[in-house]
């Protein structure tokens, strides 16, 4: 990063800290993968946090990252409006980070989004950020994409000035995507099957998504009522990503790209325990997961996207055969 870019980031951080100091922000689902990063950014900016989720004990690890009295924890479930009303009462801003990869998509991603937006509007919250996903579309054939789209519509109806962010696949030390494939490649399996090898992704660093969310809260005049699609600097295919991970951890498995006919058949068995993919996930894979042309992006929120290869090798070392002592081929 250039000296000018570093100075720009430092200035932006100082401005955010001045704006957010002592503001109360409710994070619905704040103990999750993205939530912890949003919490860390807000705590660093001097904000007060209310972490709301079904079991708040799952977010207690954030206690060690905050000052005395800076963070409170409450039980809340997006399917129960009365608990959300209590969670957002008195908040200056609310971030809804709740999503579902299985279970009742409609109740969580559509109904839950509506409950959060309606409660925030009634409570007089100044800023609401709703975390959706690239591919959200009320007409999507997948339940995940369809309910994400329905959730966005519900948020817009209840809280028109809300900011909606749609990340692509997020990566980070605790992610369930890059780590999942790295573990598979590092396993004794002699062959790694790849479904939809030509599908395109635009992986985005979770820390960048968190920074964008905080920027949207801190500057509502710039972000209110807008939808942002958040992707990283590189677009990669599924096949290329798997090969990159293999190089990064110094492994050389046989990587087999399965034809769609076989992938589709496998997805029909997705209801079985341990199945590699569900039917709904297969439907999602039929559409590239990249930022749409002309969409507002990270840059519009003052965030420079972080390349995967600048941060991932630091945690992928755990999957190398001999850890840090393994010699690897450059993962470029």
Protein language model regions, located:
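Mid/C-terminal beta-alpha module of Rossmann-like enzyme folds, strongest
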Residues: 15-19, 216-278, 291-332
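N-terminal Rossmann NAD(P)H-binding glycine-rich loop of SDR-like oxidoreductase domains
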Residues: 23-47
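SDR active-site strand-loop-helix element
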Residues: 28, 52, 97-98, 128-134, ...
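Residues forming the Rossmann-fold NAD(P)(H) cofactor-binding site
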Residues: 36, 110, 149
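Conserved glycine-rich Rossmann-like NAD(P)H-binding loop of the short-chain dehydrogenase/reductase
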Residues: 47-57
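NAD(P)H-binding glycine-rich loop region in Rossmannoid oxidoreductase-like domains
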Residues: 56-115, 119-122, 134-138
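Conserved beta-loop-beta element that borders a ligand/cofactor-binding pocket
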Residues: 132, 152-180
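A conserved pocket-lining segment of Rossmann-fold NAD(P)-dependent short-chain dehydrogenase/reductase
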Residues: 183-208, 212-216, 220-229
